[in-house]
């Protein structure tokens, strides 16, 4: 559920809803490359963690060390997290528990551009590269272009890469919306390959029976490697799957690069209607940055929504996106309300078709209560569940009691300056790291320390006080009068 919220937070419209016919990709000989990225989140301000590209003859994969940490949804999706050992930050795989070799963002982008130029150099007759990606909401081209824009590498990128193509629109045109509902990239690949696999299995059924015995033994040995190789959360795996889906959508039985010129022409003809030039994507990126500024202006209005339940947070995100895409800002709506009050807000929102009638009513009431100083800002009503937090505390307590030694050892070494610390939220006591000062032993709330024995007085040992009490009871000491201190007198010498 967290992943859905963070995905909706991206202020981008549905992917490739319209194709600009003025900037159409010209006919030519192009190299198709599947591309995908792993990011720290689903916002334009997030960073790339892994950049991957695939062709049947060569592929590119590089992990990037981000400045920010991965959010919980990204960590769960990509199985990667940021750890800190001392003053060094690094990436660690949550599957293999090994440190991942990474580079800086600018170094990884330079290697990526060199790899693309090498592909073009190997085929002098080519006209450029067409990148394939698969997403329902357009995000990958924006992230790649935003990263290149920071270092002034867009012109060099545009000389090699000519267009981006979303294979989701290709699948939508061939299969329809009903078949693509809740259909991920792997499920789509299996759906397209199902008919071809069934026909191939019927023809080669005797051979498959003889090979089952030897293949089963290898599957047990290479089980972990296969799970890692087919992990859909990795950009390297998804880039390969994107390329294979594009071939399957063109009714090609092959899962590798077509060799004949006729097959290349058929593949390009299938891709061309959905291709958009890089220049148009750059203009869209600029528009999305402007929408982000409009969306951020509505944060004070929906502050109470983000402090409540998941339902209201998703609803607030939807309202902010719709208002920003329609060109509204908080200042413009305030000017409308100042002039015509609530009726002006209703007229301004009537032309928005993406909102239902009850949603428009709720939004108008919320804006009116925010702008009117005599009214209190509307707070969404919800029923808190008293059993939920209690069960979580018990579950966390049981887990911490069983795995206390292991968790304390791992967190103390892997969570530090700038590392991911969200896993320590369920612990009762904070885990010390390089950014926090560890408390002294005398101030801890654990078992009290035993005092040292003092052998100089009678109260040092455990039996000392008892002996003193018996002596005082048997024969109490008589009171002593103060003794006068005599002063020394000088003696005179006589003859």
Swiss-Prot record:
Keywords: Developmental protein, RNA-binding. InterPro entries: Exu, Exu_RNase_H-like, SAM_Exu. Residues 207-216, 398-414 have a biased composition (Polar residues). Residues 197-217, 377-495 are annotated as: Disordered. It comes from Drosophila pseudoobscura pseudoobscura (Fruit fly). This is Maternal protein exuperantia-1. One of its GO terms (molecular function) is RNA binding. Ensures the proper localization of the mRNA of the bicoid gene to the anterior regions of the oocyte thus playing a fundamental role in the establishment of the polarity of the oocyte. May bind the bcd mRNA. One of its GO terms (biological process) is bicoid mRNA localization.
């Amino acid at each position: 559920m967290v992943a859905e919220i963070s995905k909706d937070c991206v202020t981008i419209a549905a992917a490739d809803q319209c194709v600009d016919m003025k900037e159409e990709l010209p006919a030519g000989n192009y190299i198709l490359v599947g591309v995908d990225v792993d990011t720290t989140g689903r916002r334009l301000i997030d960073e790339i963690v892994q950049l991957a590209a695939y062709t049947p003859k060569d592929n590119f994969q590089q992990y990037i060390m981000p400045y920010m940490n991965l959010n919980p949804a990204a960590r769960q999706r990509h199985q990667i997290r940021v750890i800190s050992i001392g003053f060094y930050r690094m990436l660690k795989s949550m599957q293999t528990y090994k440190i991942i070799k990474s580079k800086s963002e600018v170094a990884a982008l330079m290697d990526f551009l060199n790899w693309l130029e090498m592909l073009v150099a190997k085929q002098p007759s080519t006209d450029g590269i067409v990148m394939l990606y698969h997403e329902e909401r357009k995000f990958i081209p924006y992230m790649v272009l935003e990263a290149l824009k920071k270092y002034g590498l867009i012109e060099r990128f545009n000389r090699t890469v000519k267009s981006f193509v979303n294979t989701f629109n290709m699948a939508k045109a061939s299969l329809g919306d009903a078949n693509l509902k809740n259909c991920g990239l792997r499920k789509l690949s299996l759906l397209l390959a199902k008919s071809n696999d069934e026909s191939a299995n019927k023809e080669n059924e005797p051979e498959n029976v003889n090979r089952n015995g030897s293949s089963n033994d290898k599957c047990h040995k290479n089980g972990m490697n296969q799970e890692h190789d087919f992990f859909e959360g990795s950009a390297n795996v998804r880039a390969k799957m994107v390329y294979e889906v594009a071939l399957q959508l063109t009714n090609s039985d092959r899962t590798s690069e077509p060799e004949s010129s006729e097959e290349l022409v058929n593949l390009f003809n299938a891709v061309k209607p959905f291709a958009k030039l890089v220049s148009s994507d750059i203009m869209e990126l600029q528009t999305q940055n402007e929408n982000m500024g409009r969306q951020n202006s509505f944060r004070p209005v929906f502050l109470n929504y983000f402090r409540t339940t998941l339902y209201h947070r998703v609803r607030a995100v939807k309202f902010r996106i719709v208002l920003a895409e329609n060109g509204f800002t908080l200042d413009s709506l305030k000017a409308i309300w100042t002039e015509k009050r609530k009726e002006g807000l209703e007229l301004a929102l009537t032309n928005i078709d993406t909102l239902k009638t009850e949603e428009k009513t709720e939004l108008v009431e919320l804006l009116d209560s925010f702008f009117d100083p005599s009214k209190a800002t509307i707070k969404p009503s919800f029923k808190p569940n008293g059993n939920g937090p209690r069960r979580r505390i018990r579950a966390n307590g049981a887990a911490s009691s069983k795995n206390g030694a292991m968790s304390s050892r791992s967190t103390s070494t892997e969570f530090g300056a700038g590392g991911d610390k969200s896993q320590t939220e369920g612990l009762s006591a904070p885990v010390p790291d390089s950014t926090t000062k560890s408390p002294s032993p005398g101030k801890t709330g654990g078992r009290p320390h035993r005092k040292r024995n003092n052998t100089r007085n009678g109260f040092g040992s455990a039996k000392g006080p008892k002996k003193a009490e018996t002596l005082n009871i048997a024969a109490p000491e008589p009171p002593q009068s103060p003794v006068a201190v005599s002063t020394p007198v000088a003696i005179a010498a006589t003859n």
